[in-house]
């Protein structure tokens, strides 16, 4: 792995890239997108070859960790071909975030293709609540997907739960017990103010990480984990389990000072910060210079100067970023 060349003006090293492969999804989660979402025209979406080229050049610039995101990555046709290709790039960490719906049939193939870790969204263990949050999701299918991932030999499996008051906050103890039973880590996430939603008031629904910890501590002691997560989560352990409990707290405890990541949307926009609109059009560079990579790497390096010191999310429920999470890359 080469010495990184991606450093922003605040001295932060950027070695983690989240690549969105689609804005489409078979769910319509209330915190992620509108129910009648209009998806991008095909011609605006990067080809899998373009995504692989981006990944290859980020690795050439020192990237050690790549996560494939969406939308739902597993609804992208021929996604296994991309996984096989990126899996040959010598990454320290190669992961995917998924809603789990396609894992019953795809988990084993993903593991054999070289994917190392999976983050699986699980916002409820109640079938009716799960359907209400996802609008279209089938809980049993996702639970089967979690089992399929374990059976396929994935050792780095983590559950992600977006906690919302009045929707799923009372399920926190049950979700902890489920993670302990399955021997997988779980992270609780404060809802992020991306895109205008109508299902609930984000300010009223916000459940802070400290509130979640207070609920868990009624049942389990939480001991801060010593290892570096390499991401935004702050991890804790329980004395009687190897399972880690993580907290991603963009509102109550932002992780900006140690931010080591950027995102590329499926349109090829390089986003320097989840909570800012600063971006660089890498699709134009990819298609304008299809043969050589010099201009592409130059654009990526130069873009680091645009990375802001921090985001400015507020907890009042207002929309701070107009783009939805599915177009950002979850």
Swiss-Prot record:
The gene is moaA. GTP binds at residues 18, 67, 97, 158, 261-263. Pathway: Cofactor biosynthesis; molybdopterin biosynthesis. It catalyses: GTP + AH2 + S-adenosyl-L-methionine = (8S)-3',8-cyclo-7,8-dihydroguanosine 5'-triphosphate + 5'-deoxyadenosine + L-methionine + A + H(+). It comes from Marinobacter nauticus (strain ATCC 700491 / DSM 11845 / VT8) (Marinobacter aquaeolei). SUPFAM superfamilies: Radical SAM enzymes. Belongs to the radical SAM superfamily. MoaA family. This is GTP 3',8-cyclase. Monomer and homodimer.
């Amino acid at each position: 792995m080469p010495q990184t060349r991606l450093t922003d003006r605040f001295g932060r090293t950027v070695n983690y890239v989240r690549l969105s492969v689609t804005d489409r999804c078979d769910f319509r989660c209330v915190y992620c997108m509108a129910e009648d979402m209009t998806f991008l025209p095909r011609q605006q979406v990067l080809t899998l070859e373009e995504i692989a080229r981006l990944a290859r050049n980020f690795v050439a610039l020192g990237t050690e960790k790549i996560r494939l995101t969406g939308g739902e990555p597993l609804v992208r046709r021929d996604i296994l071909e991309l996984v096989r290709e990126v899996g040959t790039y010598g990454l320290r960490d190669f992961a995917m975030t998924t809603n789990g719906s396609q894992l019953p049939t795809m988990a084993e193939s993903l593991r054999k293709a070289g994917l190392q870790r999976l983050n699986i969204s699980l916002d409820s263990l109640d079938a009716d609540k799960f359907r209400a949050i996802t609008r279209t999701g089938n809980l049993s299918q996702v639970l089967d997907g979690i089992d399929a991932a374990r059976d396929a030999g994935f050792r780095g499996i983590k559950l992600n739960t977006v906690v919302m008051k009045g929707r799923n906050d009372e399920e926190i103890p049950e979700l902890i017990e489920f993670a302990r039973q399955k021997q997988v880590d779980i992270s609780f996430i404060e809802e992020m103010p991306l895109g205008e939603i109508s299902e609930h008031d984000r300010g009223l629904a916000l459940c802070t990480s400290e509130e979640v910890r207070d609920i868990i501590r009624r049942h389990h002691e939480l001991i801060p984990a010593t290892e570096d997560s390499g991401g935004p989560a702050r991890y804790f352990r329980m004395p009687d389990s190897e399972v880690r409990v993580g907290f991603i707290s963009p509102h109550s405890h932002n992780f900006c000072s140690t931010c080591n990541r950027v995102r590329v949307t499926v349109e090829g926009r390089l986003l320097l910060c989840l909570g800012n609109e600063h971006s660089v059009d890498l699709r134009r560079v990819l298609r304008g210079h299809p043969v050589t990579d010099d201009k592409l790497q130059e654009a990526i390096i130069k873009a680091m100067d645009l990375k802001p010191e921090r985001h400015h999310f507020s907890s009042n429920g207002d929309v701070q970023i107009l783009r939805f999470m599915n177009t950002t890359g979850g």
